[in-house]
A protein has these predicted regions:
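Membrane-interfacial helix-loop-helix modules of multi-pass inner-membrane proteins that assemble, modify
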Residues: 80-83, 126-163, 191-194, 244-257, ...
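Alpha-helical transmembrane segments of multi-pass inner-membrane proteins
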Residues: 15-28, 39-50, 73-78, 93-105, ...
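TM-adjacent membrane-interface loops and short helices in multi-pass inner/ER membrane proteins
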Residues: 262-300, 314-320
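Long, contiguous interaction/recruitment modules in multidomain scaffold/adaptor proteins
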Residues: 313, 322-417
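Transmembrane signal-anchor hairpin modules in multi-pass inner-membrane enzymes, especially those
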Residues: 1-78, 84-122, 175-181, 210-225, ...
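Flexible juxtamembrane loops connecting transmembrane helices in multi-pass membrane enzymes
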Residues: 150-154, 208-209, 234-268, 289, ...
Length: 570
């Protein structure tokens, strides 16, 4: 067999393997979960080793995106030293490790192989839509693919799933062959977008269609007809059912919507934190620390703006490098039209959501970049080099598999196993703390968590309760005030504080300690002032979102405080 034919056959094999990888990864929750990222990292390491072995070399091009990725990974690796939660911060490195490995993989591929990957996006999106939409009629499966009646697909999150479907439309619009088949695919993807109820993606879809109509003249009429047909079908659905929460949700688009006001509230709260912490709070630091700076009612893991998210995670420098790399590619004249459109869609939506936490979307982002840019360094596949590479890759894969097992145990609610395998995994430790059977066990678990993270109200609550059971009411007050600082908008925290103080006051009364009883009575009377202080710091935006602050004591509590104020403890 001729050498050229053998080489072509080899290229076809690894091209098909990579296409299968790219096709299937979105089915694993879009690679959102950390355990999925760990498994993906192992698969990418194997693919890289296979390619390097076939090509007898490793090609690395130092460009702006590689620099930004290395800075991001370095940031996630270093932030545990000063992070809000050192144990969770380390997971950020493994969460985004597949992104760097995928970019390295693209550097080993030829232009033809990379081009073929674009069509995998719509095929994957169409398949996911066709498989997940019918589950609305299968009650046992509905919760896995729908949330609040909105299609979340295999991503289990409607907005980012809708973005992925929109990304599938763009390569189909640029196809010159099989146009009828491509239009049918676009119709399925459009239907999927409407089923997600994502208003932002709907607006973005209209903009992309207008862009396509201006640049793809042959598709102008078919695209407009498809969009009009889908909108008409959605309007008919709303007219018949009266339901505007799913397919017809785009009819509720408003600049005053609770969702948009909530996003603005997140940004308003996090910007001072970013300015104050130029090196970030670490992965998940924003989530755990938000009680200390929030000015409204919300509990969100992500800022819903990826640049702000990276900035609060790892600081200014990696974020600016990453933003510059994307902006440079977006504005470059040599950027092909399809890649520019894909990049624009991802960047635009990522400014209002946490799309890049789904590594499948991160991978599409990398497809729009130029892996052949920059100075090339070729690492030859020699015996000493091979041994070093295999040992390094093997060690990294082993760590990823171990962490992946621990994180998967946590995902499956086997928290005892997750905490044994990775003691610094805070979510599982919190579950075990809540399930503690004795004060001693609760205190030990709380102390373990506090060594890494001092920003969780539940941990301080546990410490306060243990102190109360031991009769150490002064320490109880200190711990409970820490809990209030971590969850200032949780009215239940103030009510719990009320009950503990009342218990302390009544205990002191029974023991004949009038002075101490008066002290706890005074602190009881301070609770409305604590609530008023939180009201004073509350942003006007907080009153424009669905979950508004509840900072008034129930009537029976207020009545008790009124009676206490007129008693001997005044």
């Amino acid at each position: 067999m001729p050498a050229r034919l053998i080489q072509r056959k080899k290229e076809t094999i690894y091209s098909d393997i990579i296409k299968l990888f790219f096709f299937f990864t979105p089915f694993f929750f879009g690679l959102f979960y950390e355990y999925a990222a760990c498994i993906c990292a192992v698969v990418l390491l194997l693919l890289l080793l296979y390619l390097i072995d076939r090509q007898k070399k490793l090609s690395i091009r130092f460009n702006m995106l590689l620099t930004a990725l290395l800075a991001l990974l370095a940031g996630y690796l270093l932030t545990p030293f000063w992070a809000v939660d050192s144990g969770m911060a380390l997971l950020g490195f493994f969460k985004f490790l597949p992104a760097a490995l995928f970019w390295l993989l693209l550097m080993q591929l030829g232009p033809e192989v990379r081009e073929r990957l674009f069509l995998t996006i719509p095929v994957s999106g169409i398949t996911m839509t066709l498989l997940s939409y019918p589950t609305c009629w299968i009650p046992a499966l509905t919760p896995y693919f729908y949330a609040s009646g909105r299609l979340g697909g295999f991503f289990q999150y409607s907005n980012s799933f809708a973005l992925f479907l929109l990304l599938g439309i763009i390569p189909l619009a640029f196809q010159k062959k099989r146009r009828f088949l491509c239009l049918a695919g676009i119709l399925v993807l459009l239907f999927g977008i409407l089923a997600t109820g994502s208003r932002t993606v709907f607006v973005l879809t209209v903009l992309i269609f207008l862009w396509l109509c201006l640049t793809r003249k042959r598709l102008r009429i078919p695209l407009m007809l498809l969009l009009a047909a889908c909108v008409a079908a959605a309007l008919l659905f709303v007219a018949i059912t009266g339901n505007q929460d799913t397919i017809g949700r785009f009819l509720t688009i408003s600049l005053e919507s609770s969702t948009l006001m909530g996003r603005l509230l997140y940004y308003r709260d996090v910007l001072p934190v970013i300015l104050k912490h130029p090196f970030g709070l670490g992965y998940m630091g924003y989530y755990y620390a938000q009680g200390g700076f929030q000015t409204g009612v919300y509990a969100t893991k992500f800022v819903h703006n990826e640049l702000l998210q990276f900035a609060v995670d790892v600081g200014w420098i990696p974020t600016l490098l990453f933003a510059f790399a994307l902006l440079r590619r977006l504005l470059a004249r040599k950027t092909p039209a399809m890649q520019r459109m894909l990049l624009f869609a991802i960047c635009a939506h990522s400014m209002l959501d946490f799309d890049l936490q789904f590594l499948s979307i991160f991978f599409v982002l990398f497809l729009t970049m130029d892996p052949e840019e920059g100075k090339e360094i070729v690492w030859q596949w020699k015996k000493p080099n091979r041994r070093a590479l295999f040992l390094s890759a093997g060690a990294l894969a082993a760590v990823c598999l171990y962490l992946g097992a621990a994180l998967f145990a946590g995902y499956r609610k086997n928290d005892a196993l997750a905490a044994r395998l990775y003691p610094a995994y805070t979510p599982s430790q919190l579950v075990l703390l809540a399930e503690a059977r004795t004060p001693q066990e609760a205190e030990a678990r709380a102390d373990t968590i506090l060594k890494r993270n001092e920003s969780i109200a539940l941990v301080w609550d546990a410490k306060a309760l243990v102190s109360a059971t031991q009769g150490d009411f002064e320490t109880m007050v200190q711990y409970k005030r820490q809990a209030l600082a971590c969850a200032p908008y949780a009215l239940t925290e103030y009510l719990d504080y009320f009950h503990l103080l009342r218990r302390a006051m009544e205990t002191c009364q029974k023991q004949g300690e009038a002075a101490r009883a008066a002290l706890y009575a005074k602190r009881l009377l301070e609770i409305p002032d604590l609530l008023d202080a939180v009201k004073a710091r509350t942003s006007p935006l907080a009153w424009k979102i669905q979950d508004q602050p509840e900072l008034e004591l129930p009537e029976e509590y207020a009545a008790y405080l009124n009676s206490l104020q007129t008693s001997d403890f005044r």
